Protein backbone atom coordinates (compact mmCIF):
# COMPACT_ATOMS: atom_id res chain seq x y z
CA UNK A 1 0.00 0.00 0.00
CA UNK A 2 1.90 2.98 -1.34
CA UNK A 3 5.35 2.41 -2.73
CA UNK A 4 6.00 5.25 -5.17
CA UNK A 5 6.84 8.15 -2.89
CA UNK A 6 9.14 8.75 0.06
CA UNK A 7 9.44 5.57 2.15
CA UNK A 8 8.12 3.37 -0.62
CA UNK A 9 10.83 3.97 -3.20
CA UNK A 10 13.86 2.70 -1.27
CA UNK A 11 11.77 -0.10 0.26
CA UNK A 12 10.63 -1.29 -3.17
CA UNK A 13 14.26 -1.25 -4.31
CA UNK A 14 15.38 -3.42 -1.41
CA UNK A 15 12.52 -5.88 -1.74
CA UNK A 16 13.32 -6.32 -5.42
CA UNK A 17 16.94 -6.97 -4.49
CA UNK A 18 15.71 -9.71 -2.16
CA UNK A 19 13.88 -11.33 -5.07
CA UNK A 20 10.29 -10.53 -4.11
CA UNK A 21 7.51 -10.14 -6.68
CA UNK A 22 5.76 -6.86 -5.92
CA UNK A 23 2.30 -5.41 -6.43
CA UNK A 24 1.88 -1.72 -5.62
CA UNK A 25 -1.52 -0.23 -4.82
CA UNK A 26 -1.09 3.50 -5.18
CA UNK A 27 -3.04 6.58 -6.14
CA UNK A 28 0.08 8.15 -7.62
CA UNK A 29 0.97 8.25 -11.28
CA UNK A 30 4.70 7.89 -10.90
CA UNK A 31 6.35 5.11 -12.91
CA UNK A 32 7.16 1.86 -11.15
CA UNK A 33 10.24 -0.31 -11.70
CA UNK A 34 10.21 -2.92 -14.44
CA UNK A 35 8.55 -6.12 -13.37
CA UNK A 36 6.44 -4.49 -10.65
CA UNK A 37 2.66 -4.71 -10.95
CA UNK A 38 0.85 -1.43 -10.31
CA UNK A 39 -2.79 -1.11 -9.28
CA UNK A 40 -3.99 2.47 -9.36
CA UNK A 41 -6.56 3.71 -6.88
CA UNK A 42 -7.27 5.67 -3.74
CA UNK A 43 -7.30 3.41 -0.69
CA UNK A 44 -10.20 5.46 0.68
CA UNK A 45 -12.37 4.47 -2.30
CA UNK A 46 -14.18 1.15 -1.75
CA UNK A 47 -14.55 0.49 -5.45
CA UNK A 48 -10.86 1.10 -6.08
CA UNK A 49 -9.89 -1.08 -3.14
CA UNK A 50 -12.11 -3.87 -4.47
CA UNK A 51 -9.43 -4.44 -7.12
CA UNK A 52 -7.65 -6.38 -4.36
CA UNK A 53 -10.54 -8.78 -3.74
CA UNK A 54 -9.54 -12.38 -4.17
CA UNK A 55 -5.83 -11.56 -4.20
CA UNK A 56 -3.68 -13.36 -1.64
CA UNK A 57 -0.26 -12.11 -0.57
CA UNK A 58 2.63 -13.52 1.43
CA UNK A 59 3.42 -10.04 2.71
CA UNK A 60 1.36 -6.86 2.93
CA UNK A 61 3.37 -3.67 3.38
CA UNK A 62 1.30 -0.74 4.61
CA UNK A 63 3.35 2.42 4.35
CA UNK A 64 0.42 4.81 3.94
CA UNK A 65 -2.21 3.75 6.49
CA UNK A 66 -2.97 6.28 9.21
CA UNK A 67 -6.08 4.81 10.85
CA UNK A 68 -7.17 1.37 11.98
CA UNK A 69 -9.87 1.33 9.32
CA UNK A 70 -7.28 1.97 6.61
CA UNK A 71 -5.55 -1.33 7.29
CA UNK A 72 -8.70 -3.28 8.15
CA UNK A 73 -10.23 -2.47 4.77
CA UNK A 74 -7.23 -3.97 3.00
CA UNK A 75 -7.24 -7.20 5.00
CA UNK A 76 -11.01 -7.53 4.55
CA UNK A 77 -10.36 -7.89 0.82
CA UNK A 78 -7.13 -9.89 0.75
CA UNK A 79 -7.24 -11.88 3.94
CA UNK A 80 -4.28 -11.89 6.31
CA UNK A 81 -0.89 -12.26 4.64
CA UNK A 82 0.64 -15.71 4.99
CA UNK A 83 4.03 -14.41 6.17
CA UNK A 84 3.88 -10.87 7.54
CA UNK A 85 1.98 -7.58 7.72
CA UNK A 86 4.72 -4.95 7.58
CA UNK A 87 3.54 -1.64 9.01
CA UNK A 88 4.95 1.88 9.09
CA UNK A 89 3.80 3.29 12.41
CA UNK A 90 5.25 6.36 14.14
CA UNK A 91 7.04 7.32 17.33
CA UNK A 92 4.38 10.01 17.46
CA UNK A 93 2.14 7.42 19.17
CA UNK A 94 4.03 7.87 22.46
CA UNK A 95 2.82 10.03 25.32
CA UNK A 96 5.04 12.73 26.75
CA UNK A 97 7.51 11.63 29.38
CA UNK A 98 9.92 12.85 32.02
CA UNK A 99 12.41 10.10 31.16
CA UNK A 100 14.20 9.63 27.85
CA UNK A 101 14.78 7.84 25.55
CA UNK A 102 11.43 6.13 25.01
CA UNK A 103 11.39 2.39 24.45
CA UNK A 104 8.70 0.34 22.73
CA UNK A 105 6.89 -0.28 26.03
CA UNK A 106 6.51 3.42 26.83
CA UNK A 107 2.91 4.63 27.32
CA UNK A 108 0.95 5.73 24.26
CA UNK A 109 -0.97 8.96 23.85
CA UNK A 110 -4.62 8.26 22.93
CA UNK A 111 -5.02 11.89 21.86
CA UNK A 112 -2.06 11.81 19.46
CA UNK A 113 -2.77 12.53 15.81
CA UNK A 114 -0.95 9.23 15.23
CA UNK A 115 -3.21 7.28 17.62
CA UNK A 116 -4.69 5.35 14.70
CA UNK A 117 -1.33 3.74 14.10
CA UNK A 118 -1.16 2.49 17.68
CA UNK A 119 -4.73 1.18 17.34
CA UNK A 120 -3.69 -0.68 14.19
CA UNK A 121 -0.81 -2.35 16.02
CA UNK A 122 -3.16 -3.46 18.81
CA UNK A 123 -5.65 -4.81 16.27
CA UNK A 124 -2.97 -6.84 14.49
CA UNK A 125 -2.04 -8.37 17.85
CA UNK A 126 -5.66 -9.17 18.76
CA UNK A 127 -6.40 -10.72 15.38
CA UNK A 128 -3.31 -12.90 15.50
CA UNK A 129 -2.02 -11.49 12.21
CA UNK A 130 1.73 -11.96 11.98
CA UNK A 131 3.14 -8.45 11.83
CA UNK A 132 6.18 -6.25 12.28
CA UNK A 133 5.72 -2.56 12.97
CA UNK A 134 8.25 0.25 12.82
CA UNK A 135 8.00 3.48 14.80
CA UNK A 136 10.33 6.08 13.29
CA UNK A 137 10.72 9.60 14.69
CA UNK A 138 11.36 12.14 11.92
CA UNK A 139 12.14 10.40 8.64
CA UNK A 140 14.42 12.47 6.43
CA UNK A 141 16.24 11.99 3.15
CA UNK A 142 15.73 12.41 -0.59
CA UNK A 143 12.10 12.78 -1.58
CA UNK A 144 10.86 13.92 1.82
CA UNK A 145 7.54 15.67 1.23
CA UNK A 146 7.33 16.79 4.87
CA UNK A 147 9.10 20.14 5.37
CA UNK A 148 11.69 19.01 7.90
CA UNK A 149 15.23 19.44 6.58
CA UNK A 150 13.98 21.62 3.71
CA UNK A 151 12.65 24.14 6.27
CA UNK A 152 16.20 24.67 7.55
CA UNK A 153 17.81 24.63 4.11
CA UNK A 154 15.41 27.31 2.86
CA UNK A 155 16.41 29.72 5.61
CA UNK A 156 20.11 28.98 5.50
CA UNK A 157 20.49 29.30 1.72
CA UNK A 158 18.45 32.53 1.68
CA UNK A 159 20.44 34.06 4.56
CA UNK A 160 17.33 34.34 6.69
CA UNK A 161 17.21 34.52 10.49
CA UNK A 162 16.40 31.09 11.87
CA UNK A 163 13.84 30.70 14.68
CA UNK A 164 15.31 28.70 17.57
CA UNK A 165 13.00 27.35 20.30
CA UNK A 166 14.24 28.38 23.74
CA UNK A 167 17.94 27.90 24.25
CA UNK A 168 18.20 25.27 21.51
CA UNK A 169 18.97 22.37 23.85
CA UNK A 170 15.75 20.41 23.29
CA UNK A 171 16.68 16.99 21.92
CA UNK A 172 15.07 15.56 18.81
CA UNK A 173 15.84 12.58 16.58
CA UNK A 174 15.92 12.04 12.84
CA UNK A 175 16.45 8.90 10.80
CA UNK A 176 17.31 8.37 7.15
CA UNK A 177 14.63 6.88 4.92
CA UNK A 178 17.09 4.36 3.50
CA UNK A 179 17.97 3.08 6.96
CA UNK A 180 14.27 2.56 7.66
CA UNK A 181 13.77 0.74 4.35
CA UNK A 182 16.77 -1.48 5.03
CA UNK A 183 15.49 -2.45 8.49
CA UNK A 184 11.99 -3.15 7.17
CA UNK A 185 13.24 -5.37 4.38
CA UNK A 186 15.57 -7.21 6.74
CA UNK A 187 12.75 -7.93 9.18
CA UNK A 188 11.08 -10.18 6.62
CA UNK A 189 14.09 -12.49 6.79
CA UNK A 190 14.30 -12.61 10.60
CA UNK A 191 11.82 -14.88 12.37
CA UNK A 192 12.39 -13.13 15.70
CA UNK A 193 10.87 -9.94 14.28
CA UNK A 194 7.43 -11.52 13.95
CA UNK A 195 4.87 -9.77 16.17
CA UNK A 196 7.40 -7.16 17.23
CA UNK A 197 7.34 -3.38 17.31
CA UNK A 198 10.55 -1.46 16.68
CA UNK A 199 11.66 2.10 17.20
CA UNK A 200 13.76 2.92 14.16
CA UNK A 201 15.77 6.11 13.69
CA UNK A 202 19.34 7.33 14.01
CA UNK A 203 21.16 5.91 17.00
CA UNK A 204 21.57 9.22 18.83
CA UNK A 205 19.46 12.29 19.36
CA UNK A 206 20.55 15.82 18.54
CA UNK A 207 19.66 19.22 19.95
CA UNK A 208 17.70 21.73 17.90
CA UNK A 209 20.80 23.89 17.67
CA UNK A 210 22.90 20.89 16.68
CA UNK A 211 20.46 20.00 13.91
CA UNK A 212 20.50 23.56 12.58
CA UNK A 213 24.30 23.50 12.58
CA UNK A 214 24.26 20.15 10.76
CA UNK A 215 21.97 21.70 8.15
CA UNK A 216 24.37 24.63 7.77
CA UNK A 217 27.32 22.31 7.19
CA UNK A 218 25.25 20.40 4.62
CA UNK A 219 24.70 23.70 2.78
CA UNK A 220 28.39 24.56 2.92
CA UNK A 221 27.85 27.35 5.45
CA UNK A 222 29.75 27.97 8.66
CA UNK A 223 27.46 27.41 11.67
CA UNK A 224 28.84 30.53 13.38
CA UNK A 225 27.59 32.61 10.43
CA UNK A 226 23.95 31.76 11.13
CA UNK A 227 21.55 34.32 12.55
CA UNK A 228 19.78 32.26 15.22
CA UNK A 229 16.80 34.00 16.82
CA UNK A 230 15.55 32.39 20.05
CA UNK A 231 11.82 32.46 20.76
CA UNK A 232 9.74 31.38 23.75
CA UNK A 233 7.89 28.15 22.89
CA UNK A 234 6.05 27.90 26.22
CA UNK A 235 2.75 29.24 24.88
CA UNK A 236 2.69 26.81 21.95
CA UNK A 237 1.43 23.24 21.79
CA UNK A 238 4.64 21.20 22.30
CA UNK A 239 3.50 18.56 19.81
CA UNK A 240 2.40 21.02 17.16
CA UNK A 241 4.60 21.91 14.21
CA UNK A 242 3.33 25.38 13.46
CA UNK A 243 6.07 27.79 12.50
CA UNK A 244 8.88 25.42 13.52
CA UNK A 245 9.04 22.05 11.72
CA UNK A 246 9.63 19.86 14.79
CA UNK A 247 7.61 19.24 17.92
CA UNK A 248 8.84 21.56 20.65
CA UNK A 249 9.55 18.97 23.33
CA UNK A 250 12.13 16.21 23.61
CA UNK A 251 11.55 13.44 21.07
CA UNK A 252 14.05 10.61 21.46
CA UNK A 253 13.65 6.85 21.20
CA UNK A 254 15.80 3.87 22.14
CA UNK A 255 16.59 1.76 19.06
CA UNK A 256 18.50 -1.01 20.86
CA UNK A 257 15.73 -3.58 20.25
CA UNK A 258 15.81 -3.27 16.47
CA UNK A 259 19.61 -3.28 16.46
CA UNK A 260 19.75 -6.40 18.62
CA UNK A 261 16.99 -8.47 17.05
CA UNK A 262 17.67 -7.61 13.40
CA UNK A 263 21.47 -7.46 13.75
CA UNK A 264 21.14 -4.08 12.06
CA UNK A 265 22.40 -0.60 12.80
CA UNK A 266 21.66 2.69 11.02
CA UNK A 267 24.26 3.96 8.57
CA UNK A 268 23.29 7.63 8.93
CA UNK A 269 23.65 9.87 11.96
CA UNK A 270 21.97 13.29 12.03
CA UNK A 271 24.91 15.03 10.36
CA UNK A 272 25.02 12.49 7.54
CA UNK A 273 21.23 12.64 7.18
CA UNK A 274 21.28 16.38 6.55
CA UNK A 275 24.27 16.21 4.20
CA UNK A 276 22.74 13.40 2.16
CA UNK A 277 19.36 15.09 1.93
CA UNK A 278 20.92 18.34 0.77
CA UNK A 279 23.17 16.73 -1.84
CA UNK A 280 20.62 14.31 -3.28
CA UNK A 281 17.49 16.42 -3.01
CA UNK A 282 17.61 20.10 -2.09
CA UNK A 283 20.70 21.02 -4.14
CA UNK A 284 19.04 19.45 -7.18
CA UNK A 285 15.63 21.06 -6.63
CA UNK A 286 15.71 24.07 -4.28
CA UNK A 287 12.41 25.51 -3.12
CA UNK A 288 11.38 27.95 -5.84
CA UNK A 289 9.60 30.44 -3.60
CA UNK A 290 10.07 29.66 0.11
CA UNK A 291 7.35 30.89 2.45
CA UNK A 292 8.82 32.63 5.47
CA UNK A 293 5.58 34.21 6.66
CA UNK A 294 5.31 31.90 9.69
CA UNK A 295 8.60 33.21 11.06
CA UNK A 296 7.09 36.58 11.87
CA UNK A 297 4.83 35.13 14.57
CA UNK A 298 7.84 33.47 16.22
CA UNK A 299 10.61 36.06 15.93
CA UNK A 300 9.05 39.10 14.24
CA UNK A 301 11.15 38.64 11.12
Which residues does each PLM region occupy?
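Rossmann-fold cofactor-recognition segment
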Residues: 35-46, 64-66
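N-terminal Rossmann NAD(P)H-binding glycine-rich loop of SDR-like oxidoreductase domains
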Residues: 1-18
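NAD(P)-cofactor binding segment of oxidoreductase domains
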Residues: 55-105, 115-123
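Substrate-binding strand-loop-helix patch
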Residues: 143, 171-178, 198-218, 251, ...
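C-terminal amphipathic/interface module of NAD(P)-dependent oxidoreductases
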Residues: 246-301
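Conserved beta-loop-beta element that borders a ligand/cofactor-binding pocket
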Residues: 121-143
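Mid/C-terminal beta-alpha module of Rossmann-like enzyme folds, strongest
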Residues: 186-243, 284-301
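Substrate-positioning beta->alpha
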Residues: 147-152, 165-188, 195-196
Amino acid sequence: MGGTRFVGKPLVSRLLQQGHSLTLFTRGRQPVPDGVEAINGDRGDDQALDQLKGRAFDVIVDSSGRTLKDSQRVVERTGAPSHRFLYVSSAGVYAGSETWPLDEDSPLDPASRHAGKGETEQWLMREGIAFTSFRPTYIVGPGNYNPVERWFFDRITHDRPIPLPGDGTTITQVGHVEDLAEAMARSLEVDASCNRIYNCSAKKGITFQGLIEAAALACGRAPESLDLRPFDPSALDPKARKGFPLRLNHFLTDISRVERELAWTPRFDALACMANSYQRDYALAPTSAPDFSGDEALIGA
